Amino acid sequence: MMINTGLNNKYQFENFFENDGNDSAKKVARAVVEDLGFYNPLYIYGPSGSGKTHLLQAIGNKVLENNPEKRVKYISAEDLLENELEIQKVRSEEFDLLIVDDIQILGEKDILIQEKFLNLFNSQQYKNKQMVFSSDSEPDQLKSVHSHLIVRFKWGITASLTLLEKLQEGLQMNDQERLLTIFLRLQLGASLGKKQLAHE
């Protein structure tokens, strides 16, 4: 039976934008691909736009490229934690690689859902099945997440990503453009004001 991996083939290591803030995370991600279960779990955190989803998907795509027989699943935390049945379904699949994006959403779920996810984590770990998570903050900064889960997120290796330089440059350029627009409007307003006074 075909598995819905949830992966998008456009996300690859080869087209992942690198800067000084994410080179280490990419190296760790590649190491996970080469030795599934050794760095377990891999926990990647960083702000929106830093490339977390791209890197997570690249891991899954590379694993399947190297080992097509592997059972790989990429899923957003929002979808995984929607209800108990979804968590149980994923647990029963026994994926060789389980990738969960935006795990900070755990903090928005009740204790029952968090406990079900804890059972899923323990099952994967016991069977030495690789897990990869992404979040907007490091494990100790997760809000309203059970302490047992926070401890487990730190069992393997944690890597951080920073905002991509190209995006930062774009944001800075947008700020400059906005300031220039305001300045030109002020200049135009002042010029029109002078003309109006001259005609009066």
Q: Which residue stretches match the model-derived regions?
A:
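Phosphate-binding P-loop
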Residues: A31-Y39
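P-loop NTPase Walker A phosphate-binding motif
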Residues: T53-E69
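Conserved P-loop NTPase "ATPase switch" module shared by AAA+ and STAND
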Residues: R91-Q114, L120, Q130-S135
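Short regulatory helix/loop adjacent to the ATP-binding pocket of P-loop NTPases
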Residues: P139-W155
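Conserved AAA+ ATPase "SRH/arginine-finger" region at the nucleotide-binding site
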Residues: G156-Q168
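AAA+/P-loop NTPase substrate/partner-engagement loops
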Residues: E65-L97, L106
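Walker A/P-loop nucleotide-binding motif
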Residues: F38-L56
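Dynamic helix-loop-helix/coil hinge segments at AAA+ ATPase domain boundaries and subdomain interfaces
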Residues: N4-S24
